[in-house]
From Swiss-Prot:
NCBIfam families: rnpA. Its EC number is 3.1.26.5. The keyword Signal does not apply. Keywords: Endonuclease, Hydrolase, Nuclease, RNA-binding, tRNA processing. This is Ribonuclease P protein component. Consists of a catalytic RNA component (M1 or rnpB) and a protein subunit. It comes from Bifidobacterium animalis subsp. lactis (strain AD011).
C-alpha cells in the first residue's frame, strides 16, 4: 500500500466527505477512476491523521504504527483504486490492538460494500 504524501492528496480525500466511522477511528475514502496504464497494478493509498488530542508524540507514533500494520494486513478488503485517510479519535490511544484490528477490518469491509453499491 502506497502513502498519501502531500497536503493536496489529503485534502482531495477529505473534501469528498465520504466516510465511515467506528468507536476509535474515522475512515475517509475516495474510490478513484482507474487512470493507471494497462499492465500497472492499481494502487491503494493510505494517509494517517493522528492529532495532538490523541496524546503525546510517543502515543501518537504508537497509534500510527498500529494503523499502518493493520492497514497493510487488511488492504485486500479495499477496492483496487482507493485512497483512504485513517483519522484517530482520542480513544484510539487506549484501545487494544485487537479492538483496533476489529474496527479497521469492519471499516474496510464497509468501504468495499459502499463502493460496490455506487
Amino acid at each position: 500500500m502506497e502513502r498519501l504524501k502531500n497536503h493536496r492528496e489529503f485534502v482531495a480525500v477529505l473534501k469528498r466527505r465520504r466516510r465511515v466511522s467506528d468507536a476509535d477511528i474515522v475512515l475517509h475514502y475516495v474510490v478513484r477512476t482507474p487512470s493507471t496504464p494497462t499492465g500497472a497494478a492499481p494502487a491503494r493509498r493510505l494517509g494517517l491523521a493522528v492529532s495532538k488530542s490523541v496524546g503525546n508524540a510517543v502515543v501518537r507514533n504508537t497509534v500510527k504504527r498500529r494503523f499502518r500494520v493493520l492497514a497493510h494486513r487488511y488492504e485486500h478488503e479495499l477496492p483496487a483504486d482507493c485512497d483512504i485517510v485513517l483519522r484517530a479519535k482520542p480513544g484510539a490511544a487506549h484501545a487494544s490492538f485487537q479492538s483496533l484490528e476489529a474496527q479497521i477490518q469492519a471499516l474496510f469491509r464497509a468501504v468495499m460494500r459502499k463502493s460496490e453499491q455506487s
